[in-house]
Protein backbone atom coordinates (compact mmCIF):
# COMPACT_ATOMS: atom_id res chain seq x y z
CA UNK A 1 0.00 0.00 0.00
CA UNK A 2 2.84 2.37 0.90
CA UNK A 3 4.49 1.72 -2.46
CA UNK A 4 1.20 2.34 -4.30
CA UNK A 5 0.74 5.69 -2.53
CA UNK A 6 4.32 6.67 -3.34
CA UNK A 7 3.80 5.85 -7.02
CA UNK A 8 0.49 7.72 -7.05
CA UNK A 9 2.09 10.78 -5.44
CA UNK A 10 4.93 10.65 -7.98
CA UNK A 11 2.48 10.40 -10.87
CA UNK A 12 0.41 13.32 -9.60
CA UNK A 13 3.49 15.46 -9.05
CA UNK A 14 4.82 14.74 -12.53
CA UNK A 15 1.47 15.47 -14.14
CA UNK A 16 1.21 18.97 -12.66
CA UNK A 17 1.11 21.67 -15.32
CA UNK A 18 4.43 23.03 -16.45
CA UNK A 19 5.04 26.76 -15.99
CA UNK A 20 4.21 28.48 -19.27
CA UNK A 21 7.17 29.30 -21.49
CA UNK A 22 6.34 32.97 -21.29
CA UNK A 23 6.72 32.78 -17.48
CA UNK A 24 10.44 32.43 -18.17
CA UNK A 25 10.34 36.01 -19.40
CA UNK A 26 8.93 37.38 -16.12
CA UNK A 27 12.31 38.59 -14.87
CA UNK A 28 12.91 40.51 -18.11
CA UNK A 29 11.49 43.89 -18.99
CA UNK A 30 8.82 44.08 -21.73
CA UNK A 31 11.42 45.63 -24.07
CA UNK A 32 13.80 42.70 -23.45
CA UNK A 33 10.98 40.20 -23.99
CA UNK A 34 9.99 41.85 -27.27
CA UNK A 35 13.62 41.86 -28.46
CA UNK A 36 13.98 38.17 -27.60
CA UNK A 37 10.78 37.24 -29.45
CA UNK A 38 11.85 39.25 -32.54
CA UNK A 39 15.25 37.50 -32.50
CA UNK A 40 13.47 34.15 -32.17
CA UNK A 41 11.26 35.14 -35.15
CA UNK A 42 14.32 35.82 -37.32
CA UNK A 43 15.83 32.45 -36.36
CA UNK A 44 12.60 30.56 -37.09
CA UNK A 45 12.19 32.18 -40.51
CA UNK A 46 15.85 31.59 -41.44
CA UNK A 47 15.44 27.92 -40.52
CA UNK A 48 12.19 27.63 -42.50
CA UNK A 49 13.78 29.17 -45.60
CA UNK A 50 16.77 26.84 -45.26
CA UNK A 51 14.56 23.72 -44.94
CA UNK A 52 11.86 24.82 -47.40
CA UNK A 53 13.18 27.45 -49.84
CA UNK A 54 9.79 27.69 -51.62
CA UNK A 55 8.27 29.09 -48.40
CA UNK A 56 9.97 32.41 -49.16
CA UNK A 57 7.74 32.77 -52.23
CA UNK A 58 4.58 32.12 -50.19
CA UNK A 59 5.61 34.62 -47.50
CA UNK A 60 6.59 37.16 -50.16
CA UNK A 61 3.08 37.09 -51.67
CA UNK A 62 1.32 37.14 -48.29
CA UNK A 63 -0.28 39.89 -46.20
CA UNK A 64 1.95 38.79 -43.33
CA UNK A 65 3.05 35.89 -41.17
CA UNK A 66 3.32 34.79 -37.54
CA UNK A 67 5.95 32.69 -35.80
CA UNK A 68 5.61 30.89 -32.48
CA UNK A 69 8.12 29.00 -30.39
CA UNK A 70 6.36 26.38 -28.29
CA UNK A 71 7.28 24.01 -25.49
CA UNK A 72 5.08 21.11 -24.45
CA UNK A 73 5.09 18.23 -22.01
CA UNK A 74 2.93 15.13 -21.75
CA UNK A 75 2.95 12.80 -18.78
CA UNK A 76 0.59 9.82 -18.59
CA UNK A 77 -2.91 11.03 -19.57
CA UNK A 78 -2.55 14.81 -19.65
CA UNK A 79 -0.29 17.31 -21.26
CA UNK A 80 0.04 20.89 -22.23
CA UNK A 81 2.29 23.52 -23.59
CA UNK A 82 2.77 27.20 -24.03
CA UNK A 83 4.68 29.60 -26.16
CA UNK A 84 5.15 33.08 -27.45
CA UNK A 85 5.27 34.59 -30.88
CA UNK A 86 4.83 37.59 -33.10
CA UNK A 87 2.76 38.60 -36.11
CA UNK A 88 4.67 40.49 -38.79
CA UNK A 89 2.62 42.44 -41.33
CA UNK A 90 3.95 42.90 -44.83
CA UNK A 91 3.21 46.63 -44.66
CA UNK A 92 6.05 46.96 -42.09
CA UNK A 93 3.61 47.99 -39.39
CA UNK A 94 4.34 47.51 -35.71
CA UNK A 95 4.73 43.80 -34.76
CA UNK A 96 1.90 42.24 -32.75
CA UNK A 97 3.11 40.00 -29.91
CA UNK A 98 1.08 36.88 -29.16
CA UNK A 99 0.88 33.94 -26.76
CA UNK A 100 -0.30 30.38 -27.21
CA UNK A 101 -1.47 27.63 -24.87
CA UNK A 102 -2.08 23.98 -25.67
CA UNK A 103 -3.99 21.28 -23.82
CA UNK A 104 -3.93 17.62 -24.80
CA UNK A 105 -5.25 14.34 -23.49
CA UNK A 106 -4.33 10.74 -24.18
CA UNK A 107 -1.64 8.32 -23.09
CA UNK A 108 1.96 9.30 -23.54
CA UNK A 109 5.13 10.64 -22.01
CA UNK A 110 7.40 13.22 -23.56
CA UNK A 111 8.74 16.73 -23.83
CA UNK A 112 8.84 18.60 -27.12
CA UNK A 113 9.75 21.97 -28.44
CA UNK A 114 8.68 23.10 -31.87
CA UNK A 115 8.06 26.19 -33.93
CA UNK A 116 4.95 27.10 -35.88
CA UNK A 117 4.75 29.53 -38.79
CA UNK A 118 1.41 30.84 -40.05
CA UNK A 119 1.31 32.58 -43.44
CA UNK A 120 -1.73 34.77 -44.12
CA UNK A 121 -2.71 35.18 -47.78
CA UNK A 122 -5.16 38.01 -47.10
CA UNK A 123 -5.48 41.03 -44.82
CA UNK A 124 -8.82 39.61 -43.68
CA UNK A 125 -7.24 36.36 -42.44
CA UNK A 126 -4.35 38.27 -40.84
CA UNK A 127 -6.60 40.77 -39.05
CA UNK A 128 -8.92 38.01 -37.86
CA UNK A 129 -5.97 36.17 -36.30
CA UNK A 130 -4.66 39.33 -34.62
CA UNK A 131 -7.99 40.66 -33.36
CA UNK A 132 -9.85 37.45 -32.52
CA UNK A 133 -7.03 35.04 -31.85
CA UNK A 134 -7.48 31.51 -33.01
CA UNK A 135 -8.36 28.14 -31.56
CA UNK A 136 -7.86 24.64 -32.84
CA UNK A 137 -10.49 22.43 -31.28
CA UNK A 138 -10.14 18.77 -30.41
CA UNK A 139 -7.53 17.09 -32.57
CA UNK A 140 -6.95 19.02 -35.76
CA UNK A 141 -4.40 17.38 -38.00
CA UNK A 142 -3.50 18.43 -41.51
CA UNK A 143 -1.23 16.66 -43.95
CA UNK A 144 1.81 18.79 -44.59
CA UNK A 145 1.97 18.27 -48.33
CA UNK A 146 -0.55 19.42 -50.88
CA UNK A 147 0.60 17.97 -54.18
CA UNK A 148 -2.03 19.84 -56.21
CA UNK A 149 -0.61 23.22 -55.24
CA UNK A 150 3.09 22.39 -55.48
CA UNK A 151 5.72 25.12 -55.36
CA UNK A 152 5.44 27.47 -52.40
CA UNK A 153 2.54 25.53 -50.88
CA UNK A 154 4.36 22.22 -50.82
CA UNK A 155 4.86 20.96 -47.25
CA UNK A 156 2.53 23.63 -45.84
CA UNK A 157 -0.92 22.84 -44.48
CA UNK A 158 -3.97 24.92 -45.30
CA UNK A 159 -5.47 25.19 -41.80
CA UNK A 160 -8.10 27.83 -42.51
CA UNK A 161 -9.26 29.92 -45.45
CA UNK A 162 -6.28 32.02 -46.49
CA UNK A 163 -4.01 30.61 -43.75
CA UNK A 164 -1.10 28.23 -44.34
CA UNK A 165 0.95 26.62 -41.58
CA UNK A 166 4.42 25.13 -41.31
CA UNK A 167 5.58 23.28 -38.22
CA UNK A 168 9.28 22.85 -37.46
CA UNK A 169 10.55 20.21 -35.06
CA UNK A 170 14.05 19.34 -33.94
CA UNK A 171 14.20 17.02 -36.95
CA UNK A 172 13.12 19.62 -39.52
CA UNK A 173 9.72 20.19 -41.14
CA UNK A 174 6.96 18.12 -39.59
CA UNK A 175 5.40 15.53 -41.89
CA UNK A 176 2.11 16.11 -40.13
CA UNK A 177 0.83 19.28 -38.49
CA UNK A 178 -1.12 18.77 -35.30
CA UNK A 179 -2.87 21.14 -32.93
CA UNK A 180 -4.60 19.72 -29.88
CA UNK A 181 -6.81 22.24 -28.14
CA UNK A 182 -4.47 25.12 -29.02
CA UNK A 183 -5.35 28.78 -28.55
CA UNK A 184 -3.46 31.80 -29.93
CA UNK A 185 -4.13 35.28 -28.52
CA UNK A 186 -2.57 38.75 -28.15
CA UNK A 187 -0.06 39.38 -25.36
CA UNK A 188 -1.57 42.44 -23.69
CA UNK A 189 1.61 43.11 -21.68
CA UNK A 190 3.92 43.28 -24.70
CA UNK A 191 1.58 45.21 -27.01
CA UNK A 192 1.34 48.30 -24.79
Predicted regions and their residues:
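Small-residue-enriched, tightly packed secondary-structure blocks
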Residues: 24-192
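Bacterial N-terminal signal peptides that target proteins for export
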Residues: 1-8
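C-terminal segment of classical bacterial N-terminal signal peptides
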Residues: 14-22
Amino acid sequence: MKRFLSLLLCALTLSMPVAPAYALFDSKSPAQQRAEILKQNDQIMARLYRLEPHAKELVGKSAGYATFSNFGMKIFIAGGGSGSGVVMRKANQKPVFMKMVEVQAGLGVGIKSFSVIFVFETEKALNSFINSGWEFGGQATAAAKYENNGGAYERAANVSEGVWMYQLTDNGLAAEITAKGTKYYQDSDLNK
